[in-house]
């Protein structure tokens, strides 16, 4: 069958859950037996989010092929239990860069370059490329209808509907139905205005998703259907819920597949959601609970750690455990070590820069001495080596050259002649451009037999995990570390990929980011092992 396109837009305001809605629709179609892909379009002019502050953008999600993408790509992978790639996310910056490069090469034969047709044609080309090989492509447009940045994309959507027809392209619009608490009344006017704005552009949505705090009655649904020119069964309620993973089940119950099937001329859709339903029930009402101390520095925007938070939920669902996160600000921890006393384990996530480092080092020292489970990820692993070097090996000046370029004991250093995932050699220095110059994407890791990592990965000796870092553990110190009980449990082409303490119940550090490959139906092995170990050592 020809690829069918489902365009998802948002109105009234941002952060309505377009990513979760897109993921949920794609999941229901996938579980109905179709092959489904998703594309996220980001209208900002940055080439990618790789150099954006986590506090500005949230998490940067890394795909298996090394793309630094929007965090919604993480939702897509976690819901559909499949890998996505560079082609599944593009920005206005990439569109303009491509068009300008083509103009410089003379590919437009001297014509004046304009938004229409050149920019819009490039957008349509990338949308179609993302859908190749799939039955469905769900396209999520970031931002809000009416934003000037989104206009070329809406024009591209309008043209695709005109070119391909209503049996191959549908539009789903998500809006907010605010609750006026003083009157206890839901208001539909913002939604009506949002749809009017979309129709002025030339797009009439076939399905309306109403995000709201409480359910809509039949009269409100009828009113929305009439004013927004959609069928009565095409007003779908997206009510606030206890878990994002319940959303596909809620949409299924609301009947969203009925108008989708009708407009795209599909047969009856019967998704198989039994296993999904079972896991959701374990998220909402688990038998056990644990508390993990999450020592970070981007705590004012917890979406900076989105994949890691979700990976703990996945591990919890698969162990029937509620994972409670105690957020601990590493910048205030040095003078407040009592914050660590009531947690069952500690998690030290990745990050960049010197701010908050001393607090993380104190947390690592506490876990090492008190024998409580610890998982250090990326920077967390590097700091575990620095803490061990300073407090066990007596190397008081041990540091990373990221924090002290002149350190006499560079336990963590920068590889200048770096071999990337395609086998190419990149020259890297402190002055190299920030964007795209890190170790990015999926790399192999050889695991040492008999280690905790070996057990976590089901006694596999070769795994693949994703990376996003610039600095590495210095192999010059490896023999000294191992002689004193810090085991190198994983490596890749001579690079140290994972470490663990010999005389400790569970003290593991990994240079890769296991959270990027965790899925609800397939939790990452090292995250799952960490949660299981935390449960085993839970404080009574």
Curated annotation (Swiss-Prot):
Chain segments carrying region Amidoligase domain: 1-266
Amino-acid positions noted as binding CTP in the UniProt annotation, renumbered to this chain: 14, 147-149, 187-192, 223
Q: Which InterPro entries match?
A: Class_I_gatase-like, CTP_synthase, CTP_synthase_N, GATASE, GATase1_CTP_Synthase, P-loop_NTPase
Q: In which pathway does it act?
A: Pyrimidine metabolism; CTP biosynthesis via de novo pathway; CTP from UDP: step 2/2
Keywords assigned by UniProt, alphabetized: ATP-binding, Glutamine amidotransferase, Ligase, Magnesium, Metal-binding, Nucleotide-binding, Pyrimidine biosynthesis
EC identifiers of the protein: 6.3.4.2
Q: Any other comment in the entry? A: CTPSs have evolved a hybrid strategy for distinguishing between UTP and CTP. The overlapping regions of the product feedback inhibitory and substrate sites recognize a common feature in both compounds, the triphosphate moiety. To differentiate isosteric substrate and product pyrimidine rings, an additional pocket far from the expected kinase/ligase catalytic site, specifically recognizes the cytosine and ribose portions of the product inhibitor.
Give the protein name, as stated in the record: CTP synthase
Task: Look up and give the organism this protein is from.
Answer: Helicobacter hepaticus (strain ATCC 51449 / 3B1)
């Amino acid at each position: 069958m020809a690829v069918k396109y489902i365009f998802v837009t948002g109105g009234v305001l941002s952060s309505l859950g377009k990513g979760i809605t897109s993921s949920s629709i794609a999941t229901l179609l996938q579980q109905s037996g179709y092959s489904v892909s998703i594309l996220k379009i980001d209208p900002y002019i940055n080439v990618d989010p790789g150099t954006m502050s986590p506090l500005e953008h949230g998490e940067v999600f890394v795909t298996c092929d090394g793309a630094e993408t929007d965090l919604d790509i993480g939702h897509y992978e976690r819901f559909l239990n499949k890998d996505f790639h560079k082609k599944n996310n593009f920005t206005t910056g990439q569109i303009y860069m491509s068009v300008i490069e083509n103009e410089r090469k003379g590919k437009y034969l001297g014509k004046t370059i304009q938004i229409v047709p050149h920019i819009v044609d490039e957008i349509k080309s990338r949308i179609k490329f993302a859908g190749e090989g799939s039955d469905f492509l769900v396209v999520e447009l970031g931002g809000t209808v009416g934003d000037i940045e989104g206009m070329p994309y809406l024009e591209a959507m309008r043209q695709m509907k005109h070119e391909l027809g209503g049996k191959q392209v549908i539009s789903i619009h998500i809006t907010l139905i605010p609750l006026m608490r003083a009157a206890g009344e839901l208001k539909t006017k913002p939604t009506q205005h949002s749809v009017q704005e979309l129709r002025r552009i030339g797009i009439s949505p076939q399905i309306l998703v109403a995000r709201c705090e409480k359910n809509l009655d039949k009269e409100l649904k009828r009113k929305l259907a009439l004013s927004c020119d959609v069928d009565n069964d095409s007003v779908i309620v997206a009510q606030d819920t206890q878990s994002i993973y319940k959303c596909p089940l809620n949409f299924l119950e609301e009947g969203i597949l009925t108008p989708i099937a009708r407009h795209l001329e599909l047969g009856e859709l019967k998704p198989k959601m039994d296993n999904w339903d079972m896991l959701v029930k374990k998220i909402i009402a688990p038998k056990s609970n644990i508390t993990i101390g999450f020592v970070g520095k981007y705590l004012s925007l917890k979406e900076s750690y989105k994949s890691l938070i979700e990976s703990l939920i996945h591990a919890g669902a698969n162990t029937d455990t509620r994972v409670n996160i105690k957020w601990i600000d590493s910048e205030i921890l040095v003078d407040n070590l009592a914050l660590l006393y009531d947690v069952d384990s500690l998690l030290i996530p990745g990050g960049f820069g010197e701010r908050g480092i001393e607090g993380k080092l104190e947390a690592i020292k506490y876990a090492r001495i008190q024998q409580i489970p610890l998982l250090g990820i990326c920077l967390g692993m590097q700091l575990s080596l620095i803490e061990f070097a300073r407090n066990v090996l007596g190397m008081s000046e041990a540091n990373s050259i990221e924090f002290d370029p002149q350190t006499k004991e560079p336990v963590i250093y920068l590889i200048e002649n770096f071999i990337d995932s395609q086998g190419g050699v990149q020259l890297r220095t402190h002055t190299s451009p920030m964007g795209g110059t890190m170790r990015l994407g999926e790399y192999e890791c050889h695991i040492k037999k008999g280690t905790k990592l070996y057990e976590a990965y089901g006694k596999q000796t070769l795994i693949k995990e994703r990376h996003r870092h610039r600095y590495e553990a210095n192999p010059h110190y490896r023999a000294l570390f191992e002689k004193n009980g810090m085991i190198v449990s994983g490596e890749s082409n001579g690079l140290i990929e994972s470490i663990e303490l010999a005389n400790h119940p569970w003290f593991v550090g990994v240079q890769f980011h296991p959270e990027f490959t965790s899925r609800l139906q397939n939790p990452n092995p090292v995250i799952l092992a960490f949660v299981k170990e935390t449960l085993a050592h839970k404080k009574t």
